[in-house]
Amino acid sequence: ITYTSDEVHDILRTGFEKSPMFQGRIQGLGPRYCPSIEDKITRFADKNRHQIFVEPEGWETCEIYVNGFSTSLPEEVQMEALRKVPGFENAKMFRPGYAIEYDFFQPTQLKHTLETKLVKGLYFAGQINGTTGYEEAGCQGLMAGINACLSSQNKEPFILNRSEAYIGVLIDDLITKGTDEPYRMFTSRAEYRILLRQDNADIRLTQKGYDLGLVKQDRLDRLNEKLSYIEKLIAFFNTTSAIPEEINPILESLNSSKISQKTKLTKIMSRPQISYGSIEKLISVQEFLKENGTDTEAIEQAFIQIKYSGYISREKDNAEKITRLENISIPEDFEYTKLASLSSEAK
């Protein structure tokens, strides 16, 4: 990590009048979370320095990506300013920074399959839908490709909803709300974040991928083995109790209240202070692991499902209620003008 300085900012300002952003030749809104260095200097004039992340481009190259220094200023201004950044005094430039402006179609014109409503068989994915980012483009390309293939075979479309995957959140946001700036996916955009965890991505999506022909049998077999072990673990924790003599020293060391009688492990695991590492010390747990083997991913999944079961169940119920409502389809040729209960503005 390094930083710009007042001297760097002064050099960059000399090129502002030649910048297409400042001249008005580029009028589109850029990604909100990736402002150019000239934009940062202007918008945050009170800051005398800005952070730069020095990112190697690869193992076998001397190229460095200067993250935080995106710019459309003239090449000579970029070079002069770069060499005033601490650590870059002898820098050589392979490719100068540049700005692009691209057109997009409002994604509200699309179906959930990413097929256009007006032209049958035409699918849009990526920047043309108003998104920015590699993953955002990649996931749309995947979904558009899947549905184009299914359509050509007269099969049912493949749609992920908001409680099944972040892909579902992204596509639903785009086609129902549209966008007036480059759209980027964030976990905060999803209302079912307890369900959309990185630790259960394989459980959520592997079977779907297999049904589509995108996942091989051996991968599905590994998932089924994991699910079987998770089921066995949860059954064990549900039926096994801890005795005060063994568990209380552990509870005391974690500032958790002691028990006075045998207590189910699931009840103890639901306490906020208790981690799997605490439970693993119990003789009954060690005997189970010795007999059934150790799968760290499955153990983590079982622990999460037990510890947060109340929250997970509640979120699943909420998601199912919304899904039931969303499954009530309104015909595309529905005549809203004939509804007396709708206001003139709504019609």
Residue ranges and their predicted role:
Residues 53, 59, 65-129, 159-172, ...:
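A glycine-rich dinucleotide-binding beta-alpha-beta segment and adjacent secondary-structure elements
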Residues 14, 137-160:
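Internal hydrophobic alpha-helix adjacent to the cofactor/substrate pocket in enzyme cavities
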Residues 90-93, 153-160, 216-220:
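Acidic/polar loop patches that form or flank catalytic/metal-binding clefts of enzymes
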Residues 19, 89, 145-153, 174:
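A generic secondary-structure signal for well-formed alpha-helical elements
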Residues 141, 185, 308:
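Hydrophobic, well-ordered secondary-structure elements that form the walls
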Residues 1-80, 87, 167, 171, ...:
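An anion/pyrophosphate-binding glycine-rich loop and adjacent beta-alpha core
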Residues 127-135, 191-193:
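Glycine-rich phosphate/pyrophosphate-binding beta-alpha loops
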Residues 189, 195, 206-211, 215-347:
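Extended, charge-enriched "interface" segments that sit outside catalytic cores
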